[in-house]
């Protein structure tokens, strides 16, 4: 299975995987509107891979088969200062 990977020009680090290049028929219109004009990044052979960067490859394959697309969003931003305060038990009270 080879899929096309597009990046969003509106949402940083957001990627849309579709079954075939330039085929967005199965992608909801609202998602395409939010995503903005897709920019092709690469054609990706999934069968030759056992992992991807941030995405679970089995989930990507499953979503492509079931829905015709997979949306990869960036991980949430971690506030390292707040995390450190919590770890050391700091409280303003």
UniProtKB/Swiss-Prot annotation:
Protein name as catalogued: YcgL domain-containing protein Swoo_2115
Domain YcgL span(s) in chain numbering: 1-85
Pfam families named among the record's database cross-references: YcgL (PF05166)
InterPro entries: YcgL-like_sf (IPR038068), YcgL_dom (IPR027354)
């Amino acid at each position: 299975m080879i899929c096309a990977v597009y990046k969003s020009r509106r949402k940083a680090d957001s990627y849309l995987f579709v079954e075939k290049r330039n085929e967005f028929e199965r992608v909801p219109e609202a998602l395409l509107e939010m995503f903005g004009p897709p920019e092709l990044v690469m054609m990706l052979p999934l069968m030759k891979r056992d992992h991807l960067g941030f995405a679970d490859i089995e989930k990507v394959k499953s979503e492509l088969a079931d829905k015709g697309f997979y949306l990869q969003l960036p991980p949430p931003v971690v506030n390292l200062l707040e995390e450190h305060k919590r770890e050391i038990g700091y409280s303003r009270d």
